[in-house]
A protein has these predicted regions:
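A glycine/threonine-rich phosphate-anchoring loop and its flanking beta-alpha core
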Residues: 65-156
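C-terminal charged capping/lid subdomain of soluble metabolic enzymes
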Residues: 143, 247-287
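Active-site segments that bind and position negatively charged phosphate/pyrophosphate groups
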Residues: 148-257
Length: 287
C-alpha cells in the first residue's frame, strides 16, 4: 500500500495481471504456489514488492518460469532485491538452502521515502547484515589470486563497514523521524546496492563465512526466527568472526558501534546462554 502512489504512475500503460501475496515465508511450497498460478504463468514480468523473503520467493519463481523479475524494496534489511540467489527456509522458519539463480533481477527500484516510513528495526537489522559482507568477503578471499570481478567486489565491500559506522547513527535517527536524509540514503544504498554488488561480483566462495553460517545454524532455535531479524543475528556472528580471526581493531570498532545502536554483543542478547553447548546450532552451521 505504501508503494501504491509511486507505483501506479510508474506502470503507465502496463497491464497488471493480478496482485498475489507470496505467502509470508520463503519456502519452496510458496514458490510452487506462484509458479502454478495461471495468472503468474501468463505474466511477462514478475514484480516483487516487499522485503527479503518476499523478493527471494518471487526471484526463484521467476527463475523457474524463465521470466524477468523486477524488485521493489520496501525495507532495507538485506540485499535480496539485487542478488541472484534466494535464501530458502522450511515452513517452521529454519534455514533450508540457497539456490543459485540464472540471473539477477533486471531492475531494482528503491523508494527511499517508503523505506524511511517502514518499521525502523528492519533498517537497524540491515545495518548489521551489511557490515558482515566486508568482514566475510575479505576473510574468505584472503591470500587468493582473485580475478577482476572478485577483486572489484572485494574492493566494493569496504563500503559496507567504515561508511556504515560513519552514517549509521544519523541514518537511524532520520528513519525514526520518518525523514529522508543524506545519511539515510547512504545507508540504504550500502545495504541494498553495495552489498548486493559484492554478492553479484565475487566468486560464490567469497560471499559468506562464519557470520552467516552461525545465523543459519541458529535458525534451528525457534525463538531466533520468531523474535530476531536476519541481520540482527548475523551482526553477532560478525563479532564472533572478527574475534576468531584476531581482527582486534575492527572488532573494537564493530563492538562499540553495536553497543551504540543496540545490535547484539553477547549471547544473552539473542536469548541464549554461555552454558548452552549449541550442538544443534553448530551441526546446522557446518552444512
Amino acid at each position: 500500500a505504501a508503494c501504491q502512489a509511486l507505483l501506479t504512475p510508474a506502470l503507465g500503460s502496463l497491464d497488471v495481471v493480478r496482485e498475489v501475496c507470496y505467502g509470508q515465508e520463503a519456502t519452496y511450497e510458496n514458490v510452487a504456489r506462484l509458479t502454478e498460478d495461471p495468472d503468474v504463468r501468463r505474466a511477462d514480468v514478475l514484480i516483487g514488492i516487499g522485503g527479503g523473503k518476499c523478493l527471494d520467493t518471487v526471484k526463484l519463481a521467476g527463475d523457474q518460469l524463465g521470466k524477468p523479475v523486477v524488485t521493489i524494496a520496501t525495507i532495507a534489511s538485506t540485499c535480496a532485491a539485487v542478488t541472484k540467489i534466494s535464501i530458502m527456509y522450511n515452513a517452521d522458519g529454519s534455514f533450508k538452502d540457497i539456490p543459485k539463480l540464472k540471473a539477477a533481477p533486471v531492475h531494482c527500484l528503491i523508494p527511499t521515502s517508503v523505506i524511511a516510513e517502514a518499521p525502523i528495526q528492519y533498517l537497524w537489522a540491515g545495518i548489521g547484515d551489511t557490515m558482515a559482507k566486508h568482514v566475510e568477503c575479505t576473510f574468505s578471499a584472503r591470500n587468493d589470486q582473485l580475478d577482476y570481478a572478485s577483486e572489484l567486489g572485494r574492493t566494493i565491500s569496504a563500503m559496507c563497514f567504515e561508511p556504515v559506522i560513519a552514517h549509521g547513527v544519523s541514518a537511524l535517527r532520520a528513519a525514526k523521524n520518518q525523514e529522508v536524509s543524506d545519511d539515510l540514503e547512504q545507508i540504504i544504498q550500502n545495504i541494498l546496492i553495495s552489498t548486493g554488488s559484492v554478492s553479484l561480483l565475487v566468486h560464490p566462495d567469497y560471499n559468506s563465512a562464519l557470520a552467516h553460517a552461525l545465523f543459519y545454524g541458529l535458525t534451528v532455535r525457534e525463538h531466533i526466527e520468531k523474535n530476531h531479524l536476519h541481520g540482527e543475528v548475523v551482526s553477532y556472528g560478525t563479532l564472533v568472526q572478527l574475534m576468531m580471526d584476531g581482527q582486534q581493531e575492527m572488532l573494537q570498532k564493530a563492538y562499540a558501534f553495536h553497543r551504540q545502536i543496540g545490535l547484539p554483543v553477547c549471547l544473552a542478547d539473542l536469548e541464549l546462554s554461555k552454558d548452552d553447548p549449541l550442538s544443534d546450532v553448530l551441526e546446522m552451521a557446518e552444512k
